Structures are given as C-alpha cells and as structure tokens.
Amino acid sequence: MEKLYADIIINISHEALDKVFAYKVPFSMIKDIRVGQQVVVPFGRSNKEQTGYVVNLSRTVDYDESKVKEILRIETDHVGVESNMIELAAWIRENYGSTMIQALKTVLPVQEKVARKARKYIELCIEKVHGPAMLDEYFSKHYVAKARLLAALLDHGKISWEMASKDLKISKSTVDSMEREGILHVVTEYYYRNPGEFSIAKAEAHVLNEQQQELIDEFREDFLREDHKTYLLHGITGSGKTEVYLAAIEEVIKQGKQAIVLIPEIALTYQTVTRFTKRFGERVSILNSRLSKGERYDQWLRAQRGDVDVIIGPRSALFVPFSNLGLIVIDEEHEGSYKSEQTPKYHAREVEIKKAQMEGASVILGSATPSVESYKHALDGTYRLWELTKRAKEAVLPQVYIEDLREELKAGNRSMFSRRLKELIKDRLNKGEQIMLFLNRRGYAGFVSCRSCGHVMECPHCDISMTYHRDGRLRCHYCGYEQPMLKVCPECGSPYIGTFGLGTQKVEAALYKEFPQAKVLRMDMDTTKRKNSHEQILSAFSDGEADILVGTQMIVKGHDFANVTLVGVLAADLSLHANDYRAGERTFQLLTQAAGRAGRGDKPGEVVIQTYSPEHYSIQTAAKQDYHAFYKEEISYRSLMRYPPEWQMLVVFASGEDKAWLDKVMDAMANVVKHMDLMVIGPSEAGFGKINDQYRKVIYIKNKDYETLVKAKNRLEQWIDLNKIRKNLLVNFDFNPMNSY
C-alpha cells in the first residue's frame, strides 16, 4: 500500500504556527482520512496531543520521511470542513488578515457533533392472521406481558417504545425476547430538533407586479444560461423585495439548486421565516445564535444531507454546506451586522460574492437604502442594478414631517415629544390605530450639541463629531485632535450645550405619563435577552395587544404591521453626529427604514422626524425617500474626505499594558508603510483609550487601490512577526471598517 501524508493546520491561533505541518497517515486510516477532517496529532518537542484540520493529502513530503510523525486518530465527534470551504478560508485569511485556523473556524458555523434525537418504535413482524394462535399460546403459558404487547400490536401494527414501557408496562427483556422469536422488531427513527414553531401551511405565490416580473424574467434567463451575476435590488420600502427573493428562489429550486438567505438581525426571523415556510413548506431551515447546540447541529446536518432547499440566518448562515448552491440572497445588504467584529473582520457581502463565484451561484443584494459601496458598484457595472420604484399593492408613501427641536425649546416645550407628535399619538389612540416610536441610538458615542441652535462640536480636521471624555475634554478618534469641553455654545452663546442622552425606558415612562390609557411594548436589548422574546413581542404587537411599540433600530428592520399608521423618530441626531464617517449614511438608512413602517396596509401613514439638524441632507432626503439625491451628496463627501468607497481604508488597531511600548511600536508601524505611497493618519488614541488596563491606539491607512492596502497589511504582518510584536501587544487589521475605533 502506498504511503499517504496529510498537511495539517494546528488548532492554535498563533502567527508562529500559521503554516501547514506534514504528518504521516497510518495505513489503518488511509481508507477513512478525508480533507477537512479534524484529527489528533503529537505536536512539538513534548509530542503533546493537539487537534488540527487536514487541508491536503499527498503521496510524498519534501523532507526526511523518518522525521515525519504519525496522526494519532481521527476526531469522529467533530464536524469536518468541506473542501471548498478550505479554499474560501484561505481567501478570507489573505484578504482580511488572520491566521488560517481563525479563518477555518469562521467557515465552520458548527464545530461539534451532537447526539441525534431519536424515537423508538415497535413493529409487528408476523402476519395478523397468525396473531390469534400466538395469543392463545402466550396465554396458555401465562406469558401475560407478551400477550398484552402482542394484542396492542395486532390492534395498531406499530406502537412507540414509550407507549409500550409506560402504558403497557412492558420491560425491555420482554421486547428482546419477542424480537428473537421473530414476532416484532424495534425500529429507531431519527428526527431533527425543531428550532421554532413557525407556520408551514403552504400558500400560493403572489402575483408579481409588472416591475417585479421583469426582474424575475431577466433572472431566469441569466440563470438558465449559467450567467451568474450579482444583482443589486434597490426598492423603496414596501415595494415587494421579498416577493422577488421568493420568486428567484423558486426558479433556483426548479433547477435542483439550493438557496441561502441572509438576514441582518434575529428580530427578522419571525416574519421572514413564516413567509418562506408558507411558500416552500418544511424544506426551509433556520440558523441563528439563539439556537441550542443540538438545534444548530441539526439544521447544519439537514443542509449537508440535502433535506432543505432554503436556509435562512444571519452572517454565519453563509457557510452552510449545500452541495448544489444556486443563489445567495442578502437582505438589507447595507446593515453593519454583516461585518464581523471578530478576527478575521470579513464582510459577508464580499465573502458571499467570492463563495458564489467558486460554486457557480448567483447573488441578490437587496435594500431600500443600499450601502454607498454597493450602489457605486451597481453604477460602474460591477453589479447589475435592479430598481423597484412603486410600493406593492399600490400603497402610497407616508406623509413625513420634520420637527425642529430648537423651535420646540423656544416654544417652551421641554418634553421629548414635539407638539405635532403628541397630537398625532392622541389621534391614533382615539382611532384604534397603532404607533411605532423609534429611538435612533445606533452609533451613539457621546457627541456634544447645543439644544438652542443645534450646533455640534466637530473636529476641524476630519469633519466628524468629537466625543466627550470623562476628563472633560473633547477628542476626535480619527486624528487625535482634542480641546477642552465648552461651557457655552460657540455659535449662539447658549448654556444649553452638552451630551445627548435618551433611552427606551425613559421614553416608555414618558408615554405612560402623557397617555396613561395607552398599552406600550418596549423592544430593546434588555427586553429581548430570552430565547424567542423577539418573536413574542412582535407577535403581540401584530395581534393588537399594544397600541405603541417603542424600540431601537431592531424595530424598523422589515417588519410589516398593517395597522401602524404613525411612526415617530424621537432623536435623529443620535446617529447623525456619531464620530464615524458613515454617520450620515446610517442616519439616512435608519430614517428611511423607520418611515417605511408607516402606512403599509390600506390606511395612509404619517411619520414625524424630530431633530436639531433639520437642514442636513441625510434627514431631508430620508423624509422624501430620495436615495438618489442622498447618494449624490454622500459620494461627494466621501470623495472630498477620501473615505470609502472612493478611497479604500485599512485600520491597524493595537492594544497592550505598556503604553510607552505601544506608542513606540505604533510609530514604527506607521513608518513601515509611509514609504509605500499611502496616506497614513495617526497613530492616535482609540475612542476608548484604555479598557481593562489595556491601552489602545489606531493607525488609518488610505489608498485608492484595495490590493495596495492588502500588500501594506502583508508588509506589516511580516514586520510584526520578525520583531515578535505579538508577544506583548494585540494587533488587528480591519479593511473599510463599519464602526469607529
């Protein structure tokens, strides 16, 4: 028998071990070993047992065979990595900066096998005509238990083990004896754990409107001739994007293919999964972080075995092991949750496009408010642009009012509700219609503003709001500029200047005070900690158990409530002035999504946006649901300030206990890349300069070309390894970050 060798990535995340190690495959394992399996090997001088993943098999090695150690065993209770996922992991490692083992664990959403759920049944083996004679024999020999079990089997043909043991009081020895006699046999049936109670009553497909049908006709044509594109579906809120997804998936399933649907938040699960199960029945599966280990493993197994056609879930669902992948849909593609905050800091949108290219699949990116990056790709022809400009069912867009909170203060209204919003809430409560109040807290990080004139303290060098720190100073987290906190507004001289603080609990309390008869539900991180709490809150609101739903951004993501006719955005400025170059984009997206919740049924809707910055283009364009006008303003700003997508950005983040050493290393790293024709900003202190006694600093590197930044990352990694920097410091890389540091 020929020798076989395995290249193995050791399961230790350390840069010094980020390479393959060759091991000999024992003859006894040659038939069983596979690429992707987890194995146990002797590692290091002490030959300590260590796990690793097989990434390649070959007949030869490049060095002395006598020094090559043998694999000890294959880990049968661990899930292996599919071979195509190893290639994807290598791409992630190269493009985002991580070790190979970190990348492998990323593409393996389920790592441990979990015992299958099983039910035992007892089935009759003999023909029923012989049953009475056998019963007589058992009675004559006083085999009472056997007679009782046989009588039940003659009546039912098959009974559960539970019924036999609990109801009939039959022992295992009795069953074993009758099985040996050939009277019956025991059958074990495995079943999947059910992660949630979702409706699976199938419903007929909706009739598509003219715009939707045109898109599906184009998709079908492209798909049948294996022209697999990336489509950007830009549709105004309520335009029926989900119906386009469903119809496209139906086309894919007809061709024997499978589909992955990514959703941005667990809060979308209840309504989204119900819509998909109504269309495709039980062949829909769900993956999310709230599943138990067993539920998660079962859904992974269903996908691997081809028992499902559609899998729905957040970012990690991208890596399910479908064998015939035909389509990946990413709904609300602009959402920040698609970017991993853990190393490797990959973006699901970019990885799914790479995965689709590898597996011959199509991609649909959908949003009412596409990311600036995606829309730029659509305009330059990298993606195919699809647009839905009409609301489905001929529903009209809501009337939007922008309320200037500076004027409210002048009029003596110090309440968190503007006068118009109060009147409209009263009106809806009287009519028995529902209200959603949205607190735009996303990205909130202690910006300082004036309540009299709306002025926000911004960095004079970066055009980004500065953050207030406990030492009484304002800092810019991009360039490090700082200044003392002011006691009066530099624009109007008002003493009403300070940080902006507002929470959902305060809103709930204020509602009960203003409208004691109203029934209020609150949806935020505190009220959604328990499993299925999202679904329970949304279901209760949908069923009319409350008049008002108060929440953070999780309440505005794609939920349809026919009786909601009023949406209030209480403080648009909370995200608008976050110290982040994406603040304007995020504000536009959240306001547009929030406004889109009103008037989705037969009744017209109204939206109130409360702000200290009514003139800002993000607020003006969101009120009109005019994405094109917003994009024109935003891309000009990005180009002027050299932010993505006009320029590419790499963040080098480092932290450590020794501040002097951190400063020295970060200065040295900035010098390493400065001669590479790059724009290097910093090093500067991170937003939180110290956490858990770890000092934190960042360097921002910019260039028009992404590959040039990848080369800069590689150069820095080499320098870090050469100087053994990671012994004392944590260093991470983040391309085009979604959040500020």
Where are these regions (language model features)?
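Accessory, non-ATPase domains that flank or precede helicase/AAA+ motor cores in DNA-metabolism machines
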Residues: 1-314, 318-367, 379-395, 668, ...
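A carboxyl-terminal module marker
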Residues: 671, 675-695, 731-738
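A general secondary-structure junction signal
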Residues: 56-58, 108, 188-190, 439-441, ...
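Inter-lobe coupling/hinge segments of SF2-like helicase ATPases
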Residues: 202-209, 213, 226-663, 670-671, ...
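Short coil/turn motifs at beta-sheet boundaries
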Residues: 1, 16, 82, 142, ...
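Hydrophobic/aromatic-rich, well-ordered segments within soluble, folded domains that form packed cores
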Residues: 39, 88-91, 649-650, 654, ...
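Short, flexible, solvent-exposed loop/turn segments with mixed acidic/basic and small polar residues
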Residues: 11, 151, 639-644, 686-692
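A general secondary-structure signal for short beta-strands and their flanking turns/coil
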Residues: 2-5, 18, 47, 432, ...
